Amino acid sequence: MVYAVVRAGGRQEKVEVGTIVTMDRVKNQQSGKVVLPAVLLVDGDTITTDAAKLADVTVSAEILNDLRGPKIVIQKFKNKTGYKKRQGHRQDLTRVQVTEIN
């Protein structure tokens, strides 16, 4: 069993071949593929965490689609002044599927 922990959009995700990961929006989408940097690699009983060895490891993923996350509401309130502020936010996301771990 081969799996890797990759850095995807500011977070770390445990992935195998075929895993679908939702991460922050990927800007460069012309090719439809993205390479994720590996932080840890497990190949059977062998665990690799050395940065020099992980520089040779590539985790390739195919971009499936772009989407937007759920809306969150931010509210500010100050007592006794009548100050209220309400703001919403939806994060831009990209869904990718891991195609290979080399």
UniProtKB/Swiss-Prot annotation:
PROSITE patterns from the UniProt entry: RIBOSOMAL_L21
Top-level taxon of origin: Bacteria
Coiled-coil spans in chain: none
GO biological process, one term: translation
Record HAMAP family: Ribosomal_bL21
Family from the record: Belongs to the bacterial ribosomal protein bL21 family.
Name assigned to this protein: Large ribosomal subunit protein bL21
Organism: Clavibacter michiganensis subsp. michiganensis (strain NCPPB 382)
